[in-house]
Amino acid sequence: MSDTIRSGQCFCGAVRYRLHGAPMFVHCCHCRDCQKQTGGAFAVNGLIEGERVEVFQGEPQPIRMATESGYPHDIYRCTACQSPLWSDYGGRTWLRFLRLVTLDEPGAFAPDVHIYTRSKLPWVALPEGVRVFEEYYDVRKEWPAESQARYKAAKDKASASG
């Protein structure tokens, strides 16, 4: 695991954060929700433990969004410019879906998978050789063992603390 610290921020710079280490896994999500929420063709989300994202300036506010599943989806945005910085799903604040393009080095982490490609815009060309899923995927089959162990440790820690 990388102990590299990277910084990121919202569009206006009112919220700044540090990312401690690499994401467990990176999604390029082509679902309609991500398209509408970002105003783009897809969202690039790095899944990482909440405790590895350190906000050191400003404070993003969660905006609750409806989902098909019925589970809450909170998008954390800058209150000044409304840039989305990360999400959590189902109230799992211990797991962040960090918008990697908000990093000062947005190309630091390439997507591991492209998901919800059933709603991919027709003019988006996927790189040759990437793993592609029309919907979601089986984490146990796709995630590296180290990432699965990190996920389990974060989940267990969150469960133990209430």
Question: Where are the regions a protein language model picked out?
Answer:
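A short Gly-Trp-Pro
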Residues: 1-9, 14-162
